[in-house]
């Protein structure tokens, strides 16, 4: 696989990891957590992440992608990970990008957009009263073939967490 595509594939794996990091251990009702009008719920964010990645996929296959609302947050999460797998397959296969699209534009557009929303999920966890424990992502066990919801446990969780909830233990 060409170098740029390897990097994009790794980026998708990092996106899978960071998204699951933000979702792992979330309260049961987190998908419907509502901060205020005009702010997406976690379920809406995951659907939007799938949408922007589906848009990226149209630059391989053509057409449009507009995901329907699914019944559960878990289904939204599963569809998101399926979309990561579909995109990664196009990258691995060396599929041609449609005219006017490049690997750099995929990164600066939909891929980066989706990563931004993974960070928003982590922020919503804090606002929901269930913050995400910190870790050193440089040493995270991120594998390009691991794009599903079953992600590795933190390789280097932080032992010190000044903003930790009172009941947190490392």
Predicted features and spans:
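Short, contiguous alpha-helical
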Residues: 5, 9-23, 28-68, 100-162, ...
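Helix-adjacent hinge/juxtasegments
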Residues: 58-97
């Amino acid at each position: 696989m060409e170098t740029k595509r390897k990097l994009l594939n790794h980026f998708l794996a990092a996106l899978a990891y960071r998204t699951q990091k933000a979702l792992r251990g979330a309260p049961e009702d987190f998908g419907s957590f509502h901060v205020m009008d005009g702010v997406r719920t976690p379920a809406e964010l995951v659907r939007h992440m799938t949408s922007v990645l589906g848009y990226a996929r149209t630059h391989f296959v053509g057409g449009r992608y507009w995901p329907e609302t699914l019944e559960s947050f878990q289904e939204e999460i599963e569809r998101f990970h399926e979309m990561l797998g579909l995109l990664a397959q196009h990258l691995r296969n060396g599929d041609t990008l449609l005219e006017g699209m490049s690997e750099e534009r995929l990164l600066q557009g939909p891929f980066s957009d989706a990563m931004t929303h993974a960070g928003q999920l982590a922020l919503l966890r804090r606002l929901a009263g269930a913050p995400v424990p910190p870790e050193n992502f440089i040493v995270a066990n991120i594998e390009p073939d691991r794009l599903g919801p079953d992600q590795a446990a933190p390789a280097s969780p932080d032992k010190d967490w000044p903003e930790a909830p009172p009941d947190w233990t490392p």
